[in-house]
Structure formats: structure tokens, C-alpha cells
């Protein structure tokens, strides 16, 4: 740089600095003059107040003296000038202190108290924006849960007006032990058949099985427009393909978040929420009665894997406008504090993958795509080839990749039959089976039933999931198989390899404070979960009388001025064999329960009508009643009793095979109950000659 250029630049900088100094000096002078004028005016006000007090004192002693109009006019001008100056400097939300010289601090505190009252009013209005609702409105909505209350899973809810209805989610749940041959449970759709003519659509919050698992079974009976985000519809579409329902994809409606749409008489907006599956949503449902917020399943994750946190701004937007009713996830209502972020799992995965000497086998929910994604990233980091095994895991991962939710290099993946070609320390297997399902890939690996993979002593098996209530025994069984194979198992002793997808108490409080509902219906969970969520809501200022604890089948009506139970409808579960995708009749399940708990007795009798006696060809057998050595005495005892029964039977019974069967069955049933104090299943065939 030349000297001239340097001088020019210095001159320019000097000029700019001078201008800046002049501006600052001017601003300071204006501020000083303004402050001086304000102080002078305040002093004039004080002088005026003192003069007024003095004049008043003199008037009391000289009542006949005429008032000095000259002084009044002079000081009125002074006071008006001061007021004009105050008005010119007044800012909205700011009150100036006027009574600075009143005796003691009385005047000063008066002004401060006005400020306190103003702020209290603002706070009350802010905490209760639902006061803006029209309490004279006759409009109301009716809420009917068909699943998801009094249980974990199976979520389904109807929101309706006299002319229109929407169904929120259609989920499945797992059976408890004792429902033999039943793989999944789905809600009873009877009520939907009753109101089918006014159902405007099915609204999906997210793609977990407990929210979408019943959709194909519903569409086999009833079809409605199905609204959801791309991942939800992608996974539902895959289910429809498995059930031969591909033609019903024409009912799918892809929605965009933050874009309200009309569905029947409702205006619905999907709001982004964080959960243990990507593309989850809360719902803002605007009705004539008021706004309803349904959180869906949620947690408030500030550092999610995809860097897309909960849309708190949009939730707060509706909270400020005024929300009539909040329906919120209660699953983790007993858990204090906050639920850790999904991203907190990364360090534990890093350590486990780094230290693993053999194959790494990671099992989790197939829908937890971010969990799978993180595991695959660490597999790639430590130069492992990835084999994805398990139909649902492969399907979900493929859909997420095709839709662009995750990006992974295809060259890192291999097929299950290629695993044996690589050294063990270069393999990551991502698989299903975290719930101990007997048909899952992990279970079959652990029991040597898988076609390509068996567990080895040097394997590290990471089960990155918590057992769903009802699945504890199944998970324990697969753990036992793995440990017998001498595999290293990382499960619940590693607290940081699994985090919940549901909000704990502090997140529930934040949701309540953001939404500030007038009425509250805690949802998603057993009764103890919603009851605990109720207490959290009360602590956040929701009046107890404005909270109702629902159970499946309850019908609650909500309007701007009231919430009340108005009825109960038939609800329950339908049983499904997941291998055949067919429903199982309730009577079949009951028969299986009888057989399992009390055993079976089989009687095939041949009767001589004339002699009223059993023929020698009659056969008897039992299963699950007595041991083999005790069966003959039992049969002999039953035969003897039947001989006596037949002798006293009339011709009408003996000549009618159906009546003879019923007569025989009732006798055997009573005899066995008398002996064993239980009612086994009885199979009876009767023939008379």
C-alpha cells in the first residue's frame, strides 16, 4: 500500500470517527437537555403544589377574600406545560412517578401499587387467555376414547359435533399373558359403524404401531379419508400392501405442518413435535366451540438427531389465542424431571462399538428410525458392514431412506447371507426382537432357528429398548437364551442406551403452561398415569373441576363454559392372529382360556335306548385334568354316574341326540366341578340305538 493511499484511508477513518463523535455528543446533549427540562417541570409542579397548600391554609383564615385568579391562571399554565412534556415523553406500558414530594412515601407507593395492579391484570389475562372465549356460545364437542385409556397402546379417539366427526389414530396393543394364540389387540369399531355417515376423516398423529396398527383392520370394514404426514402414510401404505388393501391408498391425504385444513366441520393443523419416531405431530383442532390441542405422544427434545425440535412457537401461538381443551400424553406422568434427548445415546453407542471385539448386534423398535440411524453411523465409523435383518426393520428403514428422512451410503450394507464372509469385528447387525417376540429375528438367532445367523460367545448384543408392559416375560426369555450362548448383553444396566419418547413431569408442565387450557383431559395411559397427570395440571393452575379422567367408552361433552360426562358406549377389544392377519372370535379365545386353566374332558357315548345303558364302544379321555395313572379311575367314576343318569332319563332325551349330548355334558360338568372345583372344557358326542 502506498503512503498516499495510507493517508487517504487514515483521513477517511478520522472523518468517520469525527462524525460518530459528533452524533454521540449531540445525542448526549439532547438527553441532558431533556432531563434538565423534566427536572425543572417537576420542580415547578412541586412549587405549585406547595403554593396551593399555602393558599388553602390562608383561605381558611380569610374566608371573605376573593380568589386570586391571576395565580390560578399562571400555575395552570405551568401545570399544563409539565403535563404536555410528560405526554410527549410517555411510552406505552410505562407510568411516570408524579407525586414525588407528598408526605412520606404514600404518593410514591400509590403509583407503584398501580403498576402492581396493572401487571397482575396482564399476568392473569396471559395465564387465562381462554377468557376470550364466548361463554354464551351453545356450541360443544363430544369426546369418545375407543382405546388408549386404562391401558398402554391401542390409541383411538372420536371427536364429534352433531353433524361431523373425526377419528384420531387407530392403534393396536399387545395382549396380556393368557390370551393364547392372540398376537395383537385392536379397538372395537362398533361405535364407528353407528356414526359412519358423519365421519369426515381419520387423523394420524404419528406412525407408531399403537397409533396406526389397527388401520388395515379398520379399512377392511369402513373406509374414510386418511390424513397424515408422509412417513405415517408411507408406513400405513406398507401395511395396506401386506393386507391386500393397496387400492385404498387413494384415501390417503398428505398434510403439511403449520398449514390448517378443513376436515368436515373442523379446521386442523399438524404441529411438529419430538417423539421416538420422526415426523410426529400435535394437533390444533379449531371448532365452533373453541380450540382443542391434542399433543399426540410427545417429549420436548431440544437437541433431536435431525435438529428439528418441538415447534414451541406454534403451540404458544394457540395458547395466546385461547385454548378450550387440552388432551395430553400421560405415559411418563410418574417420572420427575425431564426425559433425556435422543442424542444423549450417542456417547454410549460410541463406547460400546469401540470396545466390541466381535460382532455387534443391536435390537430396538423398528419404528425408532433415529435410534437405528445412530447405530448405523457408529457402525460405519468403526468400519463395520451393516446387515439389517427383520422384515419390519428393513421396511421402515427403506421407506425412511426413500423419503429422504435419513441419508446412508448404500455400499455399507450387506445381506444376511453375506455376514459369514466378513470377520466378526467388521459386522453390525441391526435387527428386530427387542420385545422378545418369538418370531422376531433376534429370538430366532438366539435359539439357532435363523437361516443365516446364530449367536456366538464373542457377540455384543445391545437391546436398546424398554419392555412394554406385558412383554416382560418374553424379553426375559430371550435374554436367558442370549446369556446361555455366552454373548455379552447390554440392556437395562446401561441406562444410557435407551431413552423414552414420552414427556416427564417438567415437560408436561411446560406444555400446560404454553397451552393454558380451560379444560384438561389427560390421555394415553392406565388410570394411575392420567390421575398423576391430573395432579401436575392442578399444580400448573388448571382448576380441578375443569379436569376429567376418562376411560375407554366414556363420552364427555365440552363447551366454552362446561365439561361433563354425557354417556358411555360399548368399547372393548378385538383379537387378531398376526401371522394370518385374521380376527379371532371372542368365543375362541374364551375356549382357549378354559382349556389352559382347567383342561379338557372328551366323551363319545353310545346308548342302548331300550336298555337305557352305555355300550362298551363308548370312549372317554381327558387332557390337563389328572395324571395318566389317575385317568382310568376318573373315567370309571364318570361311566358309573352316566349309567345311573341314563336309567332315569325319559324317552324324549334318549331319542334326541342333541338333547342327549346336552344332558350328558351337564352331568359331566357338575361331576368334574364337584371333584376338582373347576370347569374344564367338555367335548361330548352322543349316539343312541
From Swiss-Prot:
It is an enzyme of class 3 (hydrolase). InterPro entries: Metallo-B-lactamas (IPR001279), RibonucZ/Hydroxyglut_hydro (IPR036866), RMMBL (IPR011108), RNase_J (IPR004613), RNase_J_2 (IPR042173), RNase_J_b_CASP (IPR055132), RNase_J_bac (IPR030854), RNase_J_C (IPR041636). Its cofactor is Zn(2+). PROSITE patterns: UPF0036 (PS01292). GO terms for cellular component: cytoplasm. Residues 1-88 are annotated as: Disordered. Zn(2+) 2 binds at residues 210-211, 297, 524. Catalytic activity is regulated by the balance between homodimers and homotetramers, with homotetramers being the active forms of this enzyme. Acetylation allosterically regulates the homooligomerization state and hence the catalytic activity. GO terms for molecular function: 5'-3' RNA exonuclease activity; protein homodimerization activity; RNA binding; RNA endonuclease activity; zinc ion binding. GO terms for biological process: protein homotetramerization; rRNA processing. Zn(2+) 1 binds at residues 206, 208, 275, 297. HAMAP family: RNase_J_bact. Belongs to the metallo-beta-lactamase superfamily. RNA-metabolizing metallo-beta-lactamase-like family. Bacterial RNase J subfamily. This is Ribonuclease J. It comes from Helicobacter pylori (strain ATCC 700392 / 26695) (Campylobacter pylori). The lineage of its organism: Bacteria, Pseudomonadati, Campylobacterota, Epsilonproteobacteria, Campylobacterales. The gene is rnj.
Amino acid at each position: 500500500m502506498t503512503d498516499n493511499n495510507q493517508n487517504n484511508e487514515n483521513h477517511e477513518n478520522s472523518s468517520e470517527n469525527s462524525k460518530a463523535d459528533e452524533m454521540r455528543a449531540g445525542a448526549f446533549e439532547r438527553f441532558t437537555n431533556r432531563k434538565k427540562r423534566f427536572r425543572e417541570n417537576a420542580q415547578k409542579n412541586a412549587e405549585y403544589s406547595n403554593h396551593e397548600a399555602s393558599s388553602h391554609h390562608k383561605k381558611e383564615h380569610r374566608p371573605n377574600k376573593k380568589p386570586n385568579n391571576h395565580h390560578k391562571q399562571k400555575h395552570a399554565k405551568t401545570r399544563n406545560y409539565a403535563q404536555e412534556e410528560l405526554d410527549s415523553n410517555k411510552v406505552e406500558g410505562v407510568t411516570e412517578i408524579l407525586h414525588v414530594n407528598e408526605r412520606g412515601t404514600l404518593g410514591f407507593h400509590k403509583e407503584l401499587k398501580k403498576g402492581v395492579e396493572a401487571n397482575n391484570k396482564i399476568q392473569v389475562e396471559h395465564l387465562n387467555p381462554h377468557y376470550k372465549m364466548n361463554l354464551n356460545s351453545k356450541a360443544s364437542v363430544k369426546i369418545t376414547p375407543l382405546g388408549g385409556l386404562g391401558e398402554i397402546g391401542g390409541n383411538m379417539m372420536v371427536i364429534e359435533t352433531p353433524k361431523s366427526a373425526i377419528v384420531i389414530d387407530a392403534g393396536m396393543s399387545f395382549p396380556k399373558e393368557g390370551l393364547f394364540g392372540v398376537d395383537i389387540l385392536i379397538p372395537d369399531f362398533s361405535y364407528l359403524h353407528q356414526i359412519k355417515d358423519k365421519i369426515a376423516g381419520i387423523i394420524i398423529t404419528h406412525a407408531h404401531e399403537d397409533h396406526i396398527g389397527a388401520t388395515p383392520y379398520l379399512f377392511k370394514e369402513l373406509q374414510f379419508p386418511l390424513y397424515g404426514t408422509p412417513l405415517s402414510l408411507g408406513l400405513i401404505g406398507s401395511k395396506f400392501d401386506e393386507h391386500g388393501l393397496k387400492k385404498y391408498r387413494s384415501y390417503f391425504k398428505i398434510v403439511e405442518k403449520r398449514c390448517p385444513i378443513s376436515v368436515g366441520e373442523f379446521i386442523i393443523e399438524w404441529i411438529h413435535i419430538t417423539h421416538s419416531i420422526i415426523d410426529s405431530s400435535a394437533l390444533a383442532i379449531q371448532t365452533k366451540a373453541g380450540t382443542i390441542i391434542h399433543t399426540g405422544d410427545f417429549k420436548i427434545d431440544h437437541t433431536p438427531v435431525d435438529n428439528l425440535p418441538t415447534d414451541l412457537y406454534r403451540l404458544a401461538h394457540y395458547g395466546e389465542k385461547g385454548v378450550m381443551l387440552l388432551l395430553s400424553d400421560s405415559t411418563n406422568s410418574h417420572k420427575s424431571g425431564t426425559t433425556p434427548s435422543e442424542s444423549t445415546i450417542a456417547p454410549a453407542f460410541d463406547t460400546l462399538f469401540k470396545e466390541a471385539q466381535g460382532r455387534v448386534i443391536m435390537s430396538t423398535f423398528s419404528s425408532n428410525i433415529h435410534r437405528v440411524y445412530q447405530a448405523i453411523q457408529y457402525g460405519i465409523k468403526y468400519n463395520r458392514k451393516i446387515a439389517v435383518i427383520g422384515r419390519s426393520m428393513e421396511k421402515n428403514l427403506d421407506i425412511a431412506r426413500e423419503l429422504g428422512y435419513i441419508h446412508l451410503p448404500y455400499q455399507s450394507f450387506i445381506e444376511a447371507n453375506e455376514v459369514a464372509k466378513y470377520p466378526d469385528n467388521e459386522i453390525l447387525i441391526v435387527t428386530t426382537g427387542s420385545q422378545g417376540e418369538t418370531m422376531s429375528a433376534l429370538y430366532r438367532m438366539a435359539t439357532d432357528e435363523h437361516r443365516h445367523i446364530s449367536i456366538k460367545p464373542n457377540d455384543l448384543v445391545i437391546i436398546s429398548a424398554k419392555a412394554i408392559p406385558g412383554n416382560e416375560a418374553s424379553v426375559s426369555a430371550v435374554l436367558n437364551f442370549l446369556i446361555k450362548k455366552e454373548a455379552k448383553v447390554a440392556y437395562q444396566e446401561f441406562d444410557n442406551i435407551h431413552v423414552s419418547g414420552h414427556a416427564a413431569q417438567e415437560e408436561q408442565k411446560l406444555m400446560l403452561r404454553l397451552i393454558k387450557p380451560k379444560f384438561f383431559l389427560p390421555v394415553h395411559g392406565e388410570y394411575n398415569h392420567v390421575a398423576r397427570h391430573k395432579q401436575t395440571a392442578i399444580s400448573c393452575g388448571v382448576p380441578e373441576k375443569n379436569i376429567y379422567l376418562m376411560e375407554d367408552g366414556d363420552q364427555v361433552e365440552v363447551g366454552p363454559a362446561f365439561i361433563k360426562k354425557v354417556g358411555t358406549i360399548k368399547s372393548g377389544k378385538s383379537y387378531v392372529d398376526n401371522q394370518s392377519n385374521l380376527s379371532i372370535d371372542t368365543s375362541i379365545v374364551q375356549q382357549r382360556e378354559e382349556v389352559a386353566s382347567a383342561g379338557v374332558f372328551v366323551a363319545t357315548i353310545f346308548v342302548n335306548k331300550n336298555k337305557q345303558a352305555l355300550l362298551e364302544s363308548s370312549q372317554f379321555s381327558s387332557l390337563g385334568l389328572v395324571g395318566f395313572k389317575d385317568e382310568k379311575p376318573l373315567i370309571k367314576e364318570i361311566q358309573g354316574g352316566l349309567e345311573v343318569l341314563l336309567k332315569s332319563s325319559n324317552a324324549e332325551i334318549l331319542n334326541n341326540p342333541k338333547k342327549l349330548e346336552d344332558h350328558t355334558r351337564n352331568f359331566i360338568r357338575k361331576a368334574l366341578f364337584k371333584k376338582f372345583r373347576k370347569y374344564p372344557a367338555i367335548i361330548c358326542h352322543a349316539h343312541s340305538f
